[in-house]
Amino acid sequence: MRVVFLGLSITSSWGNGHATTYRGLVRELARRGHQVTFLERDVEWYRSNRDMPEPEGCETLLYSTLDELRAEHAARVRDADVVVVGSYVPQGVAVGAWACDTARGLVAFYDIDTPVTLAKLARGDYEYLTPALVARYGLYLSFTGGPTLRRLEREFGSPMARALYCSVDPALYFPEDVPARYDLGYMGTYSDDRQPTVDR
């Protein structure tokens, strides 16, 4: 399959947890024989902090403006079997609507921030997604599973919401034979809204 991602950033993990998820995902898609292109908005804060300018498993192409994205990459998006638009993409509503209008294949939304996204939608903050756009995506991939998926379908009109959880990159993280020091461990991204629960 030809897969095109329009994501926040894959070239810089600076203040951006999305990069780690995308890097492992595209590498594994390529390993399975898929052709992957990642389209990334070239913004100064990531440009100044690129820790992986050429990620393994995909062709990474940068664009500076929405007009440049449309002019330079319409054929890639149109001809892709799957187009995946990620959460927090700059001008995400316009990018998502353009992808839905342009692509002939499936257009999916990959929400790496589902609780944040739902809170933003509830307060009318449409930074990268609107309720109407949820219904236009053929597939809604969410870091959150369970009843949230049904809510995305019933309340927001997603034709198909499925979990695609954050994953551990097995090339970087794997079991090792070391003595156990703890009975229980927790590894997660720090977030002010989750920390009180973790501290209990």
List each language-model region with its residue ranges.
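Short hydrophobic/aromatic-enriched beta-strand-loop microsegments
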Residues: P159-C166
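Nucleotide-activated donor-dependent transferases that construct or modify glycoconjugates
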Residues: M1-G15
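Short hydrophobic "strand-cap" motifs at the C-terminus of beta-strands
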Residues: L6, F143, M187-T189
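Conserved catalytic-core segment of nucleotide-activated headgroup transferases in glycan assembly
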Residues: T21, R27, R151, S167-R200
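Extended catalytic core of nucleotide-activated donor transferases of GT-like folds
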Residues: G15, Y22-R27, T37-F156, L172
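Cofactor-binding loop segments of dinucleotide-utilizing enzymes, especially the Rossmann-like FAD-
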Residues: L8, R41, I112, C166, ...
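Residues that mark the start of a beta-strand
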Residues: R2-F5, R104, R181-D183
